[in-house]
Amino acid sequence: MAGNLVSWACKLCRSPEGFGPISFYGDFTQCFIDGVILNLSAIFMITFGIRDLVNLCKKKHSGIKYRRNWIIVSRMALVLLEIAFVSLASLNISKEEAENFTIVSQYASTMLSLFVALALHWIEYDRSVVANTVLLFYWLFETFGNFAKLINILIRHTYEGIWYSGQTGFILTLFQVITCASILLLEALPKKPLMPHQHIHQTLTRRKPNPYDSANIFSRITFSWMSGLMKTGYEKYLVEADLYKLPRNFSSEELSQKLEKNWENELKQKSNPSLSWAICRTFGSKMLLAAFFKAIHDVLAFTQPQLLRILIKFVTDYNSERQDDHSSLQGFENNHPQKLPIVRGFLIAFAMFLVGFTQTSVLHQYFLNVFNTGMYIKSALTALIYQKSLVLSNEASGLSSTGDIVNLMSVDVQKLQDLTQWLNLIWSGPFQIIICLYSLYKLLGNSMWVGVIILVIMMPLNSFLMRIQKKLQKSQMKYKDERTRVISEILNNIKSLKLYAWEKPYREKLEEVRNNKELKNLTKLGCYMAVTSFQFNIVPFLVSCCTFAVFVYTEDRALTTDLVFPALTLFNLLSFPLMIIPMVLNSFIEASVSIGRLFTFFTNEELQPDSVQRLPKVKNIGDVAINIGDDATFLWQRKPEYKVALKNINFQAKKGNLTCIVGKVGSGKTALLSCMLGDLFRVKGFATVHGSVAYVSQVPWIMNGTVKENILFGHRYDAEFYEKTIKACALTIDLAILMDGDKTLVGEKGISLSGGQKARLSLARAVYARADTYLLDDPLAAVDEHVARHLIEHVLGPNGLLHTKTKVLATNKVSALSIADSIALLDNGEITQQGTYDEITKDADSPLWKLLNNYGKKNNGKSNEFGDSSESSVRESSIPVEGELEQLQKLNDLDFGNSDAISLRRASDATLGSIDFGDDENIAKREHREQGKVKWNIYLEYAKACNPKSVCVFILFIVISMFLSVMGNVWLKHWSEVNSRYGSNPNAARYLAIYFALGIGSALATLIQTIVLWVFCTIHASKYLHNLMTNSVLRAPMTFFETTPIGRILNRFSNDIYKVDALLGRTFSQFFVNAVKVTFTITVICATTWQFIFIIIPLSVFYIYYQQYYLRTSRELRRLDSITRSPIYSHFQETLGGLATVRGYSQQKRFSHINQCRIDNNMSAFYPSINANRWLAYRLELIGSIIILGAATLSVFRLKQGTLTAGMVGLSLSYALQITQTLNWIVRMTVEVETNIVSVERIKEYADLKSEAPLIVEGHRPPKEWPSQGDIKFNNYSTRYRPELDLVLKHINIHIKPNEKVGIVGRTGAGKSSLTLALFRMIEASEGNIVIDNIAINEIGLYDLRHKLSIIPQDSQVFEGTVRENIDPINQYTDEAIWRALELSHLKEHVLSMSNDGLDAQLTEGGGNLSVGQRQLLCLARAMLVPSKILVLDEATAAVDVETDKVVQETIRTAFKDRTILTIAHRLNTIMDSDRIIVLDNGKVAEFDSPGQLLSDNKSLFYSLCMEAGLVNEN
């Protein structure tokens, strides 16, 4: 069949050379050029050109007017000129050529295709933004075909002295080459629009459109579209504004929706859903396209050894021919009796270059597609994790801590992204091995089967090693989660840690997980990786050695150079898939673990969708807006055995009414509000809520942004109502005090605000939302009495802003009950009594009446309580009508791909500052980033962390390994040349033994090198750097935590530490290995052909230039990637902390949208970063192809001089063929080193933070019993929170005597909490000092000060762990002492009821299984244990009910009667029995005297405060 086809082709051709395709000279035959290359080019144009013409004619005009400049005119003129040349050429053909069908058909088809091209050029110029792909490829094929024709004519004229087609034909062909190349160049040039629409677009979007969208096919293949950004990065330091928009179809919103749809289909349609399959269905098409490119690349990779063999055979034959001019030429046809032409060698060399060049182009299209797929997966999964976290049930939230979910985002998603780089190698590796083995079979015959046997034997060992590594990898992820959980908890509770001086025990807890679990496991993992690496290094050598051994003893042929070096090249090609397979398997193992973790998270239980039914709002005052009935029962978790949260609930709240819920600590007040939000699991009854909801949590959730952003909360700004809200929530004075007013940054969790300010800010957010229903969880607890009265009157009362709304208030503020329309008493999760205020006051035996009678101001009625208030700042004629309040104006759906996305992202990075693209230094503290090249001292710091001696040993063994490997190949060259000389295989045993010894030595050196890397370098550095950063962060002052989002710090402990642990050592290793390999390769080539040095010097200049040109841009892009990633985690952590609030306001979509914008912002830095890598790699691999061309061409040139043997050519080119791949790896590893060393730079930045004062000052340590008296003196004391801020305490001069009980009062922001922080040196003195028992506290260490004082802080922070660990983390006290403390703090009963573990009962993250009141009591228990003479109570019982408060206050009086007590309290009645009262006003001591003395003066500030609290009256 094949013979018939050849015969038929020859008849069509009628050429003495035949159809070919390769001629005797090594070029294409004329028939092949005309009949195949040029004919196919024309058919391609006719077929696809007409298709594009039709499509463009149907397409609407793009709307962009292009200038009719010289480019289009030149194109059209040149096409017409090409038509003329083809016409002249067709007229110039001879009679013989006219009978040649291939020539005639070529001219006919070319002429037709040119007219199609002419029409397409004209139409596409106006109707397409991108240069037409069909035209580009057509002119490329035409240029190539005509150039091949030109070479064909020249070679035959040189060797045969004949002008085929005549001299005229040659000149016309030359002109055709020039014309086609010119048109190709002009078509590739970008078009210039008549209107500068891109600049307008850029102004509107604040981001430049991505040039990838408008780049032509060649620009995309060569990554030239990146050149603009590369140039910008070379000329200046890149900032976010320099980045492009993401290309089309890259938005995380679009990607996550596709993945979510497929995941939901999996859940619906399958009993065993697969997350992997959902990901494959969503993004598999891109991976298939990548697979197509990879297959082409792999085939081309194995073409090179065949070309090498042809070249060596040519060299052998040429040398043989020179030695014996009469010898016959074997392998060629008899009609070519002349000598072997040297041009054939040059053409083989050029073919090797062309294959290498094509290989590079295809490889990087493969990489582009896999990296894009990785981006898609990362964006989609990150967005889905965020969305899932918004709907997790309480039970699922308990299973997944914040640290766990952050790890899913930062580590597990990253592992899946990394997997995309390796995924195609799972088939490509075996495919390469099969091609390689087949090629070896064709080369060496049956002896290659021994190699197959070795590979099969190694498989079980490989499988065993992989199983162990998978097990260790699972453990590694578990320990990583545990460490992240501990560090997350430390950061969230850092204030308590410092107040209690618990830094040391918690640092030890963290180091226990890090050093004794995580790093120990990583050491084992490193050792197994070293064994795996040794196995895969020795396998290719064993295969080659055994194959050669079997060959020399079984085959009758000599093992000559034309067999050895192609075989050696194939063995080198075999080593890549064998080397990469363990990485692939390791990546698969890591990804499978991560997929399992993500699957578990995505299948976690969600909130019960019908827990509460949301209905349209009610219209009339008095209509039921909240209805819970049929003895409704709710659980915190779905498990039936779990403790019931609420039972037998029958509850109603009406529009326009205020319904109050009261009860003891832990009675279920918060649970009742949670069930209305839908956060609990309903097992019985029903629950309905009408209209929109606004929720104020008991612990105010404040976003890391400005005051204004916290109030607006995504709603449109309404200046008039905003002002009303500010006044009603008593924030006017606070905003006047704050430096930037409502533009002041409040810090993470509102850390720069007092408790009262946070409570009122949270309430203002609810008021401004203008919802239908308000669920308020004790917002009055953290505010002073007079502020509480203001809020009751102007917000909650009958004349307040919310008088027409449905209001449910859980409270312990008895004064609020008097204005309630309905009151419900909860006890142990059950409503025991409910009714109106009048009904309760009539029943003298009811529990509620007793509560009011004993602790509240008795009022027979409620009508006049606030009627005569003089403060009617909000109640003027400005109370808005119902309709006005309902105008809830949300932000429009903005195109966040454009300007607003950037604004949000910029704001998020600036701790959610202003929604403004510009940098405002007052609003934003952006994350610091270094600029320019990573300083050498960072590399030295890492080398020092790795242990310099170990680093030297590591590099030494790399050099030894590579030297032995090269010597093995040199020995093979020598052996094969001996065999060629003798025509047999003499002394085979001796040659094999030496070759074997060199190979084993090289593999053993690699094993030692890898063990040294992991065990003695990487682990050492990981431990050192983590310890350094941990110590520094724990010792940082509170100002650092106030101005730095926790997510940003956590990013350093998770992402940056992960890079140091897992990536940095590996990348340094591969960089050094490949750098040494390139050095040896160039040395071998230069030793073989010394002239090569004249090629390598200019190429090295280009190489270094490109690398440096690139590194400037890449470095900044990687830093921007790191910096834009931090806000994702910060926002995520912040959201998890305020889930109830986000869900309460139904803001899930908005918050998901913000998250997606932040992801897109991060991707807009990551996308150019990976493409910059491709941009450089493409250019450097082109240099690698030129090295192959240079080495091969010089070999042929020296052959002509008669100074080169086949062995030298084989050795030189076998190394040259490796250099492209090696250069590629050097580029990648240079990038990875630069990228990952930035993590060391970032860790070092946090390791060098400004520290607090020393923990211990030797020589100034106080006595053990200090303070023995409790005497406190403030001497002209002033302080501020940060150097740039105003003083918060001014010239304080007070003396508190031993055992004195002192109350501290003042309006919000007066400086009450600042006074206690000053006592603990959380803020340092700006002037003056504090003296305790005759020792100035600024002279002693912080540990000696803080652990000697006792405090119950305003923010009651609880750690994940046991009750014992929370109360006594140092294990300093006995169980009896701890139980006694719990008993005195009224928590013993609750702890016993939690589980049978007693003091080992588990508390969840943040004390989630305790109420806020119980958390405060736990802090009280801590204080009970510390035998300090000084106790500070900072609103210690603000969140407990009145009855518990009374008992606790009594306990404090008796248990601490011999101590000095400073009490800050909003309930003024709790400090009325103090010895003296400090009244603070604007940071100064306004009054300091006994309560009686201060009350006797009705003009005193204290008197007015008591008056407002209802503790005194005017009579």
Curated annotation (Swiss-Prot):
UniProt binding sites for ATP 1: G663, K664, V665, G666, S667, G668, K669, T670
Domain ABC transmembrane type-1: 287-590, 951-1235
Class in the EC hierarchy, top level: translocase
GO CC, alphabetical: fungal-type vacuole; fungal-type vacuole membrane; membrane; membrane raft
Gene3D superfamilies in the cross-refs: ABC transporter type 1, transmembrane domain, P-loop containing nucleotide triphosphate hydrolases
Miscellaneous comment: Present with 396 molecules/cell in log phase SD medium.
PANTHER family: ATP-BINDING CASSETTE SUB-FAMILY C, MULTIDRUG-RESISTANCE LIKE PROTEIN 1, ISOFORM I
Function comment: Cooperates for the ATP-dependent vacuolar transport of bilirubin and glutathione conjugates.
Name of the protein described by the UniProt record: Metal resistance protein YCF1
